[in-house]
Amino acid sequence: MTEYQVIDADETVYRDGTIKLHGPEGFEGMRKAGRLAAEILDELTSFVKPGVTTGEIDDKARTMMLDAGAVPATMGYRGYTHSCCTSINHVICHGIPSDKALKEGDIVNIDVTPLLDGWHGDTSRMFFAGEPSIKAKRLVEVTYECLMLGIEAASRPGARLGDIGAAIEAHARQFRYGVVQEFCGHGLGRLFHDAPEVVHAGRPNTGPELKHVVA
């Protein structure tokens, strides 16, 4: 049976398998951290181009976080030494920044997690370096559609965790795409990675209920 835990904004939390339910102060902290993450990705849009290295992207992301009073949550996390993840083409996720330069037509996912005032804002976005192929562009478009359908499924009253993965998988397979199941989304807040694990495939009306908390 799924356990839920109501969390005060200043309460120490632990990764204990419970799904955390935050109040208005917690949501405000996450909203600020998430907004900063989105602003960083917005700023990187014009920076990502052929010839730029993923290490330079990492440097720019780190500078923007520090300038905003945040720190990169990935820095030092389980031995990781960079400020973001940069995954090019066939790299699914968690690619490591390096001196590798982007090439014309590359698609790259940039994953940033600023830690601002004790709250995490973890998000990623797909970018094109130059002009992508029709095949690459279509992959990114369908992936984005899957994301929005997953969010829509989660937003319905009475939604369950399995509804998210079911919506994502159904749309992807409609266009003959597979769904990666070795990696997943996750809860966050005071903790970088927390319950629940949000897989990208599933059956409707299964899993824990998604509690709608007033934010």
Give the role of each language-model region.
Residues 1-215:
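Active-site neighborhoods and metal-handling regions in enzymes and metal-associated proteins
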